[in-house]
Design a protein with these regions (language model features):
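Secretory/periplasmic and organellar redox-cofactor proteins
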Residues: 1-6, 45
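Polar low-complexity intrinsically disordered regions
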Residues: 5-7, 64, 152-153
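Short, glycine-rich nucleotide/cofactor-binding loops
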Residues: 8-18, 47-48, 92-97
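Histidine-anchored nucleotide/phosphate-binding helix
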Residues: 19-32, 37
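Short internal beta-strands
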Residues: 35-41, 117-120
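N-terminal beta-loop-helix "entrance" segment that forms/cooperates
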Residues: 44-57
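A glycine-rich helix N-cap at a beta->alpha junction
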Residues: 55-90, 98
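A charged, amphipathic interaction segment
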Residues: 82-140, 144-146
């Protein structure tokens, strides 16, 4: 086990929870720790690139994709979502207080060398293709996560 290694499972696509995951991850990486973020189920929506279009999806995959937020700009809040007004208010307050927005946090995470892994099984179940993910994301299964987690001093589930 290495105290300088951290893993975070990102299961949620709630904006506030995702922000917490990236704040912890970038903070640890800035302190010199090795960080792996494993995105599974709803957390995969964080990695979807709103600008990318993918061909060849089945009808059900298209419907599933249409019902999920595509990218970090569309994420709901876990509390006080208010039909989508909550995230807008949160972003307004963040900007006013000079808090880094999620797209910038993701970019910073990549610059800090944080490994971002998308769960292959969840991608398959939810009809998410590698081509629609942001650049720099690795694909891996539960064995990938467990291999990283078995060496880490801290493992979080968000």
């Amino acid at each position: 086990m290495r105290e300088d290694k951290k893993t975070i499972i990102v299961f949620s696509n709630d904006m506030d929870k995702v922000m917490a995951a990236f704040v912890i991850a970038t903070g640890a990486a800035a302190m010199g720790d090795e960080v792996t973020m494993f995105f599974t189920f709803w957390g995969l929506n964080v990695l979807r690139d709103a600008k990318k279009k993918v061909q060849g999806k089945s009808f059900l995959e298209k419907m599933f994709g249409a019902m999920m937020p595509k990218g970090v700009e569309k994420l709901p809040l876990s509390k006080m979502n208010f039909l989508g007004i909550g995230p807008k208010l949160m972003k307004y307050m963040m900007k006013k207080k000079n808090v880094m927005m999620l797209p910038e946090m993701i970019k910073q995470a990549q610059e800090l060398g944080i490994k971002m892994v998308a769960c292959s099984m969840s991608m398959d179940v939810m009809g998410i293709k590698k081509e629609e993910l942001i650049d720099g994301v690795e694909i891996g299964g539960v064995a990938t996560y467990l291999g990283e987690a078995s060496e880490a001093g801290v493992n979080l589930f968000i």
